[in-house]
Regions:
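Conserved phosphate-binding/catalytic loop of the ribokinase/pfkB sugar-kinase fold
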Residues: 61, 87, 97-133, 138
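Active-site-proximal loop->helix
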Residues: 66-78, 97, 102, 106
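Conserved beta-alpha-beta core of the PfkB/ribokinase-like small-molecule kinase fold
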Residues: 132-202, 212, 220-222
Length: 306
């Protein structure tokens, strides 16, 4: 069956250490817990979309190791097509997550994610071309983004995380950009992240993206800037957040889900804010991602107007 959503991105083994505070340079601190789990922005977004009821295919890479086999199994358990997940001659990617309740600081070693390039996307060009939505991030080589931009015919969403410079001709080929404050600053070459909504909007104007931009603002919600329309502030849902690790990834998946459901950008961002807020009420990355039934108890899969 043809997937509705293709995610081209990273697959990592997450090692999450619970700390009271992030250590300073040269300092050692003790962790109060260690959790190993599947992760990577690509995996998180794929699982998030699948749990919202979408048919999802993953294009990525893992190593020929226990972590890689565990990641494949985790995706298959979610009903995700892993035919596009290559086995690389290098270890599965690793992310060390320092969790400082509820925020996280993350260090990534790409490992097998380094082979997710133009050639790999080319092998799976038919799936990318035929998908109704394609989600990308920046934990894989830039060539993968170029290939998606040249191949996809559906809605393309780029989450430029982690914050790296993305050439204008690449980012402009994506319909929707979903940066956070820091990533937005990196895209425009600013030396500091924007504080106020006015500063965020000014940076979006500087970015001059021909498509839509949705800037995620954590507890402040999101600023939605549709192409050719006035910006709209979308408030965050009030929840007792315990872990924000996968909030941005679930937001991106839910935004695409809302657009595919027929919502406009603002409606879809409201739905994404709802999904992201729910994500923060549970611990972990993949483990925290909600199902549609968790959010719509009366059977309405995407209550965009609620």
């Amino acid at each position: 069956m043809t997937p509705e959503v293709v995610v081209v991105g990273s697959l990592n083994r997450d090692l999450r250490l619970t700390v009271d505070r992030i250590p300073r340079s040269g300092e050692t601190v003790s962790a109060s817990g260690l959790v190993r789990s599947p992760g990577g922005k690509g995996a998180n977004q794929a699982v998030a979309a699948a749990r919202l009821g979408r048919r999802v295919a993953m294009v990525g890479a893992v190593g020929d190791d226990d972590d890689g086999r565990a990641l494949r199994a985790a995706l298959v358990a979610e009903g995700i097509d892993v035919g596009g997940v290559a086995t690389a001659d290098r270890p599965t990617g690793t992310a060390v997550v320092l969790w400082e309740r509820p925020e996280s600081t993350i260090v990534i070693e790409a490992g097998a994610n380094a082979v997710v390039d133009e050639a790999l996307v080319g092998v799976h060009a038919a799936a990318v071309r035929d998908a109704r939505a394609v989600l990308c991030q920046c934990e894989t080589p830039l060539g993968a983004l170029r290939a998606v931009a040249a191949t996809a015919t559906g809605t393309t969403v780029l989450n430029p995380a982690p914050a790296v410079p993305v050439p204008r001709e690449v980012r402009d080929a994506f319909r929707v950009l979903v940066p956070n404050r820091f990533e937005l600053a990196t895209l425009v070459g600013a030396t500091h992240e924007p504080g106020s909504a006015e500063e965020v909007l000014a940076m979006v104007r500087t970015l001059d993206h021909p498509g839509d931009v949705v800037v995620t603002l954590g507890a402040d919600g999101a600023l939605v800037v549709p192409a050719g329309s006035a910006p709209v502030a979308v408030p965050a849902r009030a929840v007792d957040a315990v872990d924000t690790t996968a909030a941005g990834d679930s937001f991106c998946a839910a935004l695409a889900d809302g657009l595919l459901h027929g919502g406009d950008l603002v409606e879809s961002a409201r739905w994404a804010a709802r999904v992201a807020a729910s994500t923060t009420t549970r611990h972990g990355a993949v483990d925290s991602l909600p199902r549609a039934t968790d959010l719509a108890p009366e059977g309405t899969r995407i209550p965009l107007h609620s």
